[in-house]
């Protein structure tokens, strides 16, 4: 459960690395330009989705983990997840998977073990505010609930968050919640009851209560928020908060997420911290319950120095502790920070050109000392981008 799956974006592969030994376990073929990796609830299966709509499943419990099935779900896709619920309503662990497509705009429910397509549901819909029909209402992010047999599916152009009940896929129930338009990435709060998602071109975070199945709030944040799945912190003053970075400005902003014990801070921006330099460019922000830090990347900033830097904040004071520049021998941008299972290491990809693998690497930093402790290199390390720890991803720890 400390394996790390690393997307090798432009060579159409995913590398599986042992997070303890740092040794390469296998490299598997995938769809084109894999967007994300997700794991089944048991941790046995690794799911990938390419931007070409090809989904693959890797069995991590094989002696040498490898691809066991693939399916073409559409022509353009971004999201995939599995069923994670086990409780009074049934045992759905590893039973289903779901893919969200850009084109055609639909979601596809799959058998979680074989990827056999079971149900296709169109997401063409109406905009929640102007009531205009949108044929290309694309599926952005998808997350799986731990408390109910349902997926949270974000319909980008319509501004709707769909709660898709998979307890009976022959007659699925869908709660369509009006939120805000141009929904993109998002993640759970610490309780996994509330889902927070960026409506990035509206500079808004939409928050849904998945228990009550209703919109809680639309909270204005900075310019073009891009949280990935965000970062959850138990703050000494504000209680549980969830944080995002931004593509359009240099701030980290955090929203209170505890309406019971900290109602005065709930659904408000309670922290606004600034990073050095002009502009944003942040794609990912990450922390871990065992870590005192927040790590932030800025690969899409216009300044080459900031593209190649990582920013580390104290998660209680939100003071900048370090701006870490990657070694000069590597040519590329620092992208996607990810903790190991124990929360004492931070992995980051150095994303460069496809034909220059010798100038790219996966760097591993000690979260306590903030020093570089390991460099993973080789001819196979070509265009590394996202990397996903098995345990943290299947448990939604971020």
Regions found by a protein language model. Give the residues of each.
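Predominantly soluble domains enriched in secretory-pathway, periplasmic, or organellar proteins
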Residues: 1-398
């Amino acid at each position: 459960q400390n394996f790390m799956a690393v997307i090798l974006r432009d060579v159409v592969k995913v590398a599986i690395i042992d997070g303890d030994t740092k040794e390469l376990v296998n490299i598997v073929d995938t769809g084109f330009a894999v967007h994300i990796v997700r794991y089944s609830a048991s941790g046995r299966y690794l799911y990938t989705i390419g931007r070409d709509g090809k989904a693959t499943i890797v069995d991590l419990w094989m002696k040498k983990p490898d691809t066991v099935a693939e399916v073409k779900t559409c022509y353009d896709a971004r999201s995939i997840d599995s069923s994670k619920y086990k409780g009074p309503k049934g045992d759905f662990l590893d039973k289903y998977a779901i893919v969200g497509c850009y084109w055609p705009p639909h979601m596809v429910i799959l058998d979680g073990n074989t990827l056999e397509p079971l149900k296709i549901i169109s997401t063409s819909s109406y905009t929640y505010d102007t009531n205009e029909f949108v044929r290309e209402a694309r599926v952005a992010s998808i997350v799986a609930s731990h408390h109910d047999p349902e997926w949270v599916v974000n319909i980008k152009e319509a501004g709707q968050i769909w709660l898709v009940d998979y307890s009976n896929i022959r007659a699925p129930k869908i709660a369509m919640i009006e939120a805000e338009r141009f929904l993109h990435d998002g993640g759970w709060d610490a309780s996994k009851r509330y889902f927070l998602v960026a409506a990035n071109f509206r500079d808004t975070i939409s928050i849904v209560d998945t228990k009550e199945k209703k919109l809680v709030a639309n909270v204005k944040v900075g310019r073009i928020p891009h949280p990935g799945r965000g970062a959850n912190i138990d703050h000494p003053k504000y209680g549980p908060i969830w944080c995002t970075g931004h593509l359009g400005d240099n701030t980290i902003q955090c929203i209170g997420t505890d309406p019971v014990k900290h109602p005065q801070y709930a659904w408000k921006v309670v922290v606004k911290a600034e990073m050095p330099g002009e502009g944003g460019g942040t794609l990912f922000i990450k922390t871990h319950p065992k870590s005192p830090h927040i790590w932030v990347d800025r690969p899409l900033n216009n300044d080459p120095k900031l593209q190649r830097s990582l920013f580390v904040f104290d998660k209680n004071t939100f003071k900048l502790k370090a701006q870490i520049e990657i070694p000069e021998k590597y040519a590329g941008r620092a992208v996607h920070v990810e903790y190991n299972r124990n929360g004492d290491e931070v992995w980051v990809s150095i994303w460069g050109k496809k034909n220059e693998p010798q100038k790219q690497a996966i760097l591993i930093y000690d979260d306590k000392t903030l020093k570089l402790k390991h460099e993973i290199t080789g001819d196979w390390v070509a265009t590394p981008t996202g990397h996903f720890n098995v345990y943290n991803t299947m448990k939604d720890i971020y």
